[in-house]
Amino acid sequence: MVRKLATPTILQWPALLGGGKGGRFARTLLVIGIATISTCGITPCLAQGPAATVEVPVIVDSPAITSLRASDPQSPFELARAAQLALDLGRADVAIEFLTKLVADGPEAGALLDAHRRLGTAHFLRFQNNVAIQPVGTEVANRVLEAAANYAADPDRLARLVQQLGDGDSAKRRQASDELMRAGKHAANPLFEVLADPDQEDLHPRARVMLVELGQAIHGPLLAALESDSDTLVASVIQVCGAIRHKAATDLIVGRFGLAPDDSRVAAAAETALIQLAGNAPARHEVELYLRHRAQVYLRPEPMFAPDQQGEVEFWNWEEAQAVETRLPVFDAQVRIADRLLSNLEEISDSPLTPGLANQRLLARLQLAKLDSGLDTPLSEESLQAFAPTSLSDLEQALESALPRRELTPAAIAATEALAAHGDVSLLVTRDKRPSPLAMALESDYHQVRLAAALAILRLDPTRMYAGSSDVLRTLERTATAAGRRIVVIADPHQERATLLAGIVQTVGFEPVVVSGGSALFREAYRTIDVEFLLISENVSGPILTETLQILRKDRRTADLPIGVLADPETLMTREVQTAGDPRTLAMITPQDEEGFVFQAEQLLRSPGRMLVTAEQRLADAELAMTALAKLANQRQRYSFYDLWPLESTLLSRLREGALTEDVAMVLGYLGTPAAQQSLVEVASDTLRPLPQRQACVEAFTHSVESRGLLLTKDQILRQYDRYNGSETLGADTQTVLAQILDALEAPTKGVRFDQPAIAPENRE
């Protein structure tokens, strides 16, 4: 028996083929079809007559498949096993039936665990990797593997297993040991809990043996546990580190060795472990030298650990008497270890740290404080209080030390906030013909540092000119250009290729701006902080590629901006060599489709690491900048040394764009220029704008007229009367807004002719 199907494409044929006798026949038919196509062409052979069809045999179940169906599998174990058997028989369609039923049944975690225990992880990984049974194959695999992972990490179950290590029945002890081995790193904390409890000392030897058996799986948790306040636990952990030759623990063990009294358990365990790890234990006077040297090594920019593709490493902290796993950039992990070593050194040493070490210690503390709060979140009052005893000169030195090093930007930001908290405006005084460290921070290549420095200076509230005052305004102005857009500037003299790429860029959610190169490229790259990255053709017009890149990198607005150099396949290797020294410039082949562009865009956006500023954060920063500018504009006499007039064009552009309209309107109202008043009136009269924006513009215009006088021309004023008179058919809200504009116009002009160019407050009647 056969049924008629619409003619399939060649790519659809494999999905119609199955196993068994019918499958073999279908495969033969496919071979014949391909041979026919190759000899006579697809149109004459497959499209005969007005309704071309082809006869395809129905897939007939083989005896094995029939038997498999008849077994009627029900449990997750039975269904998963039956699905794999169906795959082995070449029937992906039947496997999908079984797996779909498994998902639809919604089994409990216990049933999924039973399937995992009996079939193993590899069984479900095959489901995940088999393209013929997607997406249900991946869904089943994820559910089963998630249930297994949750079971393995269940702390209550693991705690019971640790207690079972002390059972009198050797079989039960062996079972507990096997289960803990399968739990891997998750077994560490329950074992640590026992080792920290003096009342369970009888179980300590077995717990230590279990840690030794776990070996490399718990290297990270062991390092974290060395921070514990429990000497009982620390002594046991040190013993384990020595037994498994955990060389990465050597530095931390030396620190604990230096802190421990000579006759303590920790000192004895550390001495033995250091002999096992390094061949000998250091003398007491050598401990300080060792810690000083190792801390300096960890604070160097060179990586001490092998990172993953994202530049991160697995790191374990000791928090609330537990080892907690996290992932950190390599340098952040190094800073945390250096901070531990320097902290130990401070406790051990009878004398203060040398100035150089004290500076490094402060840098580490600032870095960690900022990382803990978040790069875009101000330090808490508690954190700032921790730096209150630190002298201003030490904080300034730390800031100056951090500025040239990209990896220390969190420390630089924290230093600016700590300096601002001191509230001493003398921090801005120029010394030895050099600007203050805060003023130097305004010239940083990184937006976060520049903005933090500007906000810190404004918090100090200077009332007279200082070195860097113009840079504060430039920083606020550029920050205020954000509108939450995601702009990609494409520089390519080949118009057709650039247009194609722009279409791809727009499809995936970015806003393309196409230029051929030269001055247009620099203008668009500098225009707004919303530019997320640049795509520059190797054949860019204007300055040659290498000069173009140099110019962009020397300007602080684009110094850290990701740049993709679009190259031909033949020249790609050359461009890779040319850009190898700049980790934020990547050579790439011009993408031809969305998938290729998304892959390359992800690479580019990963290159700045944590210094990448998202569209949401840019918009939040713009609000901060506008608030600061509003304060300066509102108190013009107090802050007369700030020249706000150059900001007018930027603010007018922002008002037209519609982002942060309320904040921009406020600043323009305080600025009180003719162009500002005209723009406020135009936006307030625009019925397509949201009502809150229009009301904000009316309020700002009213304030501007009251403080600066009416600066509109006669024609502009008469236009507002025409608008009001023509608003009979408009809504009540619009009529109210237009009436408020007239109220503001008429307040200072009563009894004055409209042909007067402007009416200043001092000339009013």
Where are the regions that the model predicts?
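Output/docking surface of receiver
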Residues: 516, 566-610
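Acidic, metal-coordinating helix/loop segments flanking the phosphotransfer/catalytic sites
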Residues: 516-533
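Conserved phosphotransfer microenvironments
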Residues: 533-554, 559-560, 566-575
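Conserved acidic segment of CheY-like receiver
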Residues: 484-506, 534
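Short hydrophobic/Thr-rich beta-strand motif most characteristic of the beta2 strand and flanking loop
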Residues: 509-517
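Short coil/linker segments at helix-helix boundaries
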Residues: 111-114, 118-123, 293-344, 369-396, ...
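Amphipathic alpha-helical scaffolding segments comprising HEAT/armadillo-like alpha-solenoid repeats
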Residues: 96, 108-115, 152-163, 185-196, ...
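Structural detector for internal amphipathic alpha-helices that build alpha-solenoid repeat scaffolds
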Residues: 81-88, 97-101, 114-118, 130-132, ...
